[in-house]
Amino acid sequence: PEEFALFRDKIFPIVMQWEGGGKLHNVAGDSGGWTIWGIAFNYWKSLFKDFNDFKDTTMEEASYIAFVKFYLAIRADAMPYETKLYYFDMAYNMGTSRAIKIMQQCAGVKDDGVIGMITLSKMKNIKEECLKSKRESFYNRLSESKTTLKKFLKGWLNRSKSIYDFKY
């Protein structure tokens, strides 16, 4: 309950500033398709009865989904307090597997995308600066290899910096 309260009251609202809030939107070129509260219908259809159910998602419902499917899935609860926001935002923006692999690179363990006992034991030593550096390098490489995504690069980098600079 304490970890969820931190997430719901502090972390999730900050990230929502970069996700269009509760406005239903569909950005051309974004593979997620229709999105509300940062939840992409194309990726999370199974959580909803239909599109109407999806488009009526409240912020509270979205925070539960994000907490379980992202925050807990990446074990943000095991991260140092000052890195929880940045690490969660990485996962919410680039996917859980990519975020975990970047975190593992910063931890100096095999970046296989699986959080086992070795990774878990190293997570308390993760530095936010390392996450930021590797995240931004990933965005730059991605926009170079997939030119259709280049239009998102400036926004991704602005988001990374803003979340990094934010202190709660």
Predicted features, each with a name:
Residues P1-Y168:
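Cell-wall polysaccharide-cleaving catalytic domain and substrate-binding groove, primarily
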